[in-house]
Every structure is written in C-alpha cells, then in structure tokens.
Amino acid sequence: MGKSLIQQRRGKGSPTFRSPSHRFRGAVKYIPLNYTQDKTLRGVVEEIMHDPGRTAPVARVRFENGMEKLIIAPEGLLVGQEIYIGPDAPIAIGNTLPLAKIPEGTYVYNIEGIPGDGGKYVRAGGTYALVVSREKDKVIVQLPSGELKAFNPNCRATIGVVAGGGRLEKPLVKAGKAYYKYKARNRFWPTPRGVKMNAVNHPFGGKEHHPGKPTTTSRRAPPGRKVGHIAARRTGRRK
C-alpha cells in the first residue's frame, strides 16, 4: 500500500503544516470606526518590534483613550513619536485618515476595503499605494501591482511607506538561510518532486525519474491518485 501524498498530509492539518500563530505579535487593525468617526485620537509609539508572522515590523501604540493597538510601522517611525488617527489628523507619516481627506499624490498603506474593517490592502514590507484622484463617491488608488482600484472615501489608510523594504535585495546564497526563512512560518520546505520519489510515495515515483504514465488525472480520482494535471482540457505547448 502506498503512502499519503504531501497534499493529503497537509489537508489533515498536523502541526507540521500549521502556522505557528502563537509566536506572532497579534492582529494589526485600526481602532474601531465608532471611536474615530467624529474625533481624532492621539497616540504615542511605545515600542517597535519584529513580527515573525509578517514581512514588516509592527509598532505598539498607546492612545489617549487608554486603548493599545499594534500598527504596521512605516519608514521613519520613531519610538516616542506621536501619531494621530481620525478625520482631522495632520498629513504626516504614520497618521491615519479617511481617503477623502488625503491629497492626491500621497503614499499610503494598510487601506481598508470596507469602512471599519481595520485595513486589508498594502501591508507587506516596503510596499505603498498612491492616491491618484478623488471624486464625490470614490477615491482612485494605484496599488503596488499598478492596478487602479476605487475605494469608498470613508475607508481609512495610513500615510507613508511600509518599513522593511529591500529585504529581498540580499540573496539567500545558501540553503541554510532558506531553512530558517521557511521555519519562521513553519512552511513545509524543501518540497520534493514526485518523479524523484520512490514508487511507494507518489504515483509518478520510481521508474527512471519520469512519470511513466499520462500526467492528466480525472477530477473524480481518489485522493491518493489525484496528482498532475487535474481535469486538464489540454497539456503541452500551443501549436
């Protein structure tokens, strides 16, 4: 009898394939909208920390109403710096305002998709979006991919560029560095190819390092055989 495929083991959800969220700093969300809809809150940056769960550092901020929140740190943020969140916050790095209040040409990040959802877009290290234009019922923002997306004017965003940029410029060079990179998030690495496995481990294993059978597979194949081009309409080069 053959052994379980990697995707079968992953689907079972053993600790090998689970993200170690107990090591992460916590959720990064804006203060609920009802606290800042009509007034602006002042906060002080107490600490800037590394977060194994994301590519950007996070900052712990204590606000004047006693709430303590984690925010994604922008480039240039300092411990002890005052930041503001609300409709009347000044246009400065680290401050959070509705998109309707942010001028065109401003770099922003951590943009809400729906007013009050806490921030969904542009959160990775070194990324930023650009406010392109403002209209009565929408604000056009250019995302890091180059896509122009329309947002509700009441969606909040933070001014600045996410810290942690340039992390991909230094090459890994050796496998040991990659090992620790993936270990931080418990990624299953390295991932062997099926044709390099023994026949007991994979339908394409054994033989002479080639599948030995068609790689197209039925959509209704059982889990241990469902590998390769699943329900493919066609394979190979277009002619």
From Swiss-Prot:
HAMAP family: Ribosomal_uL2_A (MF_01320_A). One of its GO terms (biological process) is cytoplasmic translation. SUPFAM superfamilies: Nucleic acid-binding proteins, Translation proteins SH3-like domain. Belongs to the universal ribosomal protein uL2 family. One of the primary rRNA binding proteins. Required for association of the 30S and 50S subunits to form the 70S ribosome, for tRNA binding and peptide bond formation. It has been suggested to have peptidyltransferase activity; this is somewhat controversial. Makes several contacts with the 16S rRNA in the 70S ribosome. Keywords: Ribonucleoprotein, Ribosomal protein, RNA-binding, rRNA-binding. GO terms for cellular component: cytosolic large ribosomal subunit. One of its GO terms (molecular function) is structural constituent of ribosome. This is Large ribosomal subunit protein uL2. InterPro entries: NA-bd_OB-fold (IPR012340), Rib_uL2_dom2 (IPR014722), Ribosomal_uL2 (IPR002171), Ribosomal_uL2_arc_euk (IPR023672), Ribosomal_uL2_C (IPR022669), Ribosomal_uL2_dom3 (IPR014726), Ribosomal_uL2_RNA-bd_dom (IPR022666), Translation_prot_SH3-like_sf (IPR008991). The keyword Lipid biosynthesis does not apply. It holds the Pfam family Ribosomal_L2. Residues 203-239 are annotated as: Disordered. The keyword Hydrolase does not apply.
